A protein has these predicted regions:
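Short acidic/histidine-rich active-site segments
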Residues: 236-237, 269-293
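Structural preference for beta-strand elements that scaffold enzyme active sites
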Residues: 2-5, 45, 104-108, 131-132, ...
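Conserved, mostly hydrophobic/aromatic
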Residues: 7, 38, 90, 129, ...
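Short catalytic helix/loop segments, enriched in acidic residues and glycine
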Residues: 19-40, 298-300
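Active-site beta-loop-alpha junctions enriched in small/polar residues
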Residues: 9-11, 51, 90, 110-112, ...
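A metal-dependent hydrolase metal-coordination microenvironment
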Residues: 30-32, 36-123, 138-175, 191
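Histidine/acidic residue-rich metal-binding segments in metalloenzymes
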Residues: 117-127, 149-202, 215-230, 257-273
Length: 329
């Protein structure tokens, strides 16, 4: 079963290893994702996020520099293993990579704050190959507010959403065919996107709030709106977003059976076409039954036990994401 994963933080971990003077091989390493694990998991495409923490305490830390360094790592990986993996910037790239038997890699950004409110920076990121971007991570920025807030993980931010510059970014992202990613965005920001977007958008790594009440997950109303706009949501393997006990993350566990329940809820509320995968590999800790990309057959088996047909499992694993990006790149 082919796999299309909408989100991982592997570039961040590779950059961190380089900064520590102990670079990791992309052929085989101790991370959740490397080329061997992608082979074992039968991957078609992995979205690689250039992620940055705006509160990075490192002296002289600059979010844009951090993102550019991660993009540089992405480019170097593509150049180092051209016979195994190749970037996807257009739908034609995907078809060519499939025909040549290569893994595909799509470049994304997690934290629109790296642009510092500059549309010029956004346009440059698109030229470098970025095809999806979250407006926020866990901190307010020039574009929007997140759901992370002092009230804790069970409290959603319904008061602040996109800024004036955030709306300008949304408009420009749609012109540039950079998919707007609403994962991490506040509830208010989500509805701002719904009400002002003209193209489908994604929640690259978010689950169902009805099953796990963390504010990073989507309410049923959000799932319906996302589906109506032609969007997709990637199942996130993070234990706090999978388990029902989101208020106690140290006690949470992510199992394939529980992930299958989230998939079933997505299907019931928004239909099968809204569901995709968004592992958050290399960005999550804790107890996870899916320990690496090599373990993906386990989730397919759980989905079948949950009652999904083979066609539906295939839709979740790659066909929905393939359709979405074929129409939106």
């Amino acid at each position: 079963m082919k796999v299309w994963d909408l989100h991982c933080d592997t570039l961040y971990e590779l950059r961190r290893a380089e900064k520590a003077g102990a670079p990791k091989s992309f052929l085989h390493n101790d991370l959740h994702i490397d080329l061997e694990k992608l082979r074992q998991g039968d991957y078609l495409l992995q979205c690689f996020a250039a992620y940055v923490d705006l509160a990075d305490p490192a002296p002289g830390a600059d979010p844009l520099v951090s993102v550019l360094e991660e993009i540089d790592i992405f480019k170097r990986l593509m150049a180092a293993y051209p016979e195994k993996i190749a970037p996807v910037y257009t739908a034609a790239d995907l078809e060519r990579n499939r025909a040549e038997g290569k893994f595909s890699a799509m470049l994304t950004v997690e934290e629109g704050g790296c642009c510092k409110g500059s549309l010029g920076v956004l346009r440059r990121l698109q030229e470098l190959g970025v095809r999806m971007m979250t407006l926020t991570w866990n901190y307010p920025n020039e574009l929007a507010a997140p759901n992370a807030n002092p009230g804790g993980p069970l409290v959603a931010n319904t008061e602040t959403g996109l800024t004036e510059q955030g709306f300008a970014f949304l408009e420009e992202m749609e012109k540039l065919h950079i998919t707007a990613d609403v994962s991490h965005l506040s509830d208010k920001g989500f509805w701002d996107i719904v009400n002002h977007s003209t193209r489908p958008f994604a929640a690259s790594h978010s689950n169902c709030r009805a099953l796990s009440p963390h504010n990073r997950n989507l309410t049923d109303e959000m799932i319906r709106a996302l589906a109506e706009k032609g969007g997709i949501a990637g199942l996130n393997y993070c234990a706090s977003f999978v388990d029902a006990d989101s208020a106690h993350p140290k006690l949470c566990r992510s199992t394939v059976e529980r992930l299958a329940k989230h998939a079933a809820h997505f299907k019931q509320v928004g239909g099968i076409e809204v569901i995709s995968l968004g592992s958050d590999f290399d960005g999550i800790g804790g107890q996870h039954e899916l320990e690496t990309a090599a373990d993906m057959p386990l989730l397919a088996e759980a989905l079948r036990r949950e009652g999904f047909t083979e066609d539906e499992v295939e839709a979740i694993y790659w066909r929905n994401a393939y359709r979405f990006f074929k129409n939106n790149l």
